[in-house]
C-alpha cells in the first residue's frame, strides 16, 4: 500500500472512530460507565491506528523490534498503573 493511501485510510478511520465516540456519548442511553468503556476502547484502537498508519511503526528493517519495544512499554505501564491502583486500594481498605 502506498504512503498516500495509508495516510488517507488512517485519516478516514480516525475520523470514523472519533464520530463513533461522539455518537455514543450524545445519542445513546447507555450508562456513564458503559459510555466511558466504549470511548476508551475507541481511543486505544485509534492510538494503535496512529502508530501503524502515521508513525510507520512496522516499517523498516527493525520494524518488528520497534513493535516489541512498544508492546513491552505498554505492558510495563499497565503493570505500574494496575499495581499502583492495587496498593492504593489495599491501603485504603485496611484503614476503614
Curated annotation (Swiss-Prot):
Top-level class of the enzyme under EC nomenclature: oxidoreductase
InterPro entries: Cyt_c_oxidase_su4_prok, Cytochrome_c_oxidase_bac_sub4, QoxD
GO cellular component: cytochrome o ubiquinol oxidase complex; plasma membrane
UniProt topology in membrane: Multi-pass membrane protein
Keyword Transmembrane: yes
Keywords attached to this entry: Cell membrane, Membrane, Oxidoreductase, Transmembrane, Transmembrane helix
GO molecular function list: cytochrome bo3 ubiquinol oxidase activity; oxidoreductase activity, acting on diphenols and related substances as donors, oxygen as acceptor; proton transmembrane transporter activity
EC number: 1.10.3.-
Transmembrane segments annotated in the record for this chain: 8-28, 36-56, 68-88
Recorded catalytic activity of this chain's protein: 2 a quinol + O2 = 2 a quinone + 2 H2O
Cellular localization per UniProt: Cell membrane
NCBIfam families associated with the record: QoxD
Function: Catalyzes quinol oxidation with the concomitant reduction of oxygen to water.
Membership in a protein family: Belongs to the cytochrome c oxidase bacterial subunit 4 family.
Protein name: Probable quinol oxidase subunit 4
Organism (species): Staphylococcus aureus (strain NCTC 8325 / PS 47)
Amino acid at each position: 500500500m502506498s504512503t498516500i493511501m495509508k495516510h488517507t485510510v488512517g485519516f478516514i478511520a480516525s475520523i470514523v472512530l472519533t464520530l463513533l465516540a461522539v455518537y455514543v456519548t450524545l445519542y445513546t442511553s447507555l450508562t456513564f460507565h458503559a459510555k466511558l468503556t466504549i470511548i476508551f476502547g475507541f481511543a486505544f484502537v485509534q492510538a494503535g491506528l496512529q502508530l501503524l498508519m502515521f508513525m510507520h511503526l512496522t516499517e523498516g528493517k527493525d520494524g518488528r523490534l520497534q513493535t516489541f519495544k512498544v508492546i513491552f512499554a505498554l505492558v510495563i505501564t499497565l503493570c505500574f498503573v494496575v499495581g499502583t491502583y492495587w496498593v492504593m486500594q489495599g491501603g485504603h481498605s485496611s484503614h476503614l
